Amino acid sequence: MQHTKILHLVILATALFSLLLVSATYSGYIYAQNSQTKFRAKLDSNNEVPPVNSTAEGVATFKLKNNTVNTKINITGITDLSGAQILSGKKGENGQPIVDLLKKVQKTKTSGGVAVEGSFTASDFEGAMKGKALSALQSAMGTNETYVNIKTKDHPDGEIRGQIKPKGSSSPTQ
């Protein structure tokens, strides 16, 4: 009888240890998924919904550091930039604004285009993301659920757009 009790305790201890090990491993996996800090979007008029006729194109990059997102957007073929936002939405879907990328920026005209550099924090969020932590945006950016939309006077709903993905990801950018 004593031998059976000891065997049961050993089995119970082994099961608890296994659960703790799986839990710790899973937590590490979740952290690794959300630890991506660099993101990129390739901007193009064919990605607009519906697509527009424009030769403009660009690249937007985002780097998360110390609860701040630093942004860089380089665009060619546009000189009259009137808006730049991150919005929620998958490829082919229009979504709701998350953050205005022109709120805190330094905008310079380049030969044949525009370069924008700036930053934002979670306090700049609007819409459904308002009041949420930066990690919520980080998670959405890592799963292709956000996009950048660039607006102009000729195309007030958007001239070029691109899905945000982790930098270096091999998944499609559009």
Walk through the language-model features, giving the residues of each.
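Bacterial Sec-dependent N-terminal signal peptides
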Residues: 1-13
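Metal-centered catalytic cores of metalloenzymes
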Residues: 2, 22-84, 88-174
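Bacterial N-terminal signal peptides
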Residues: 11-23
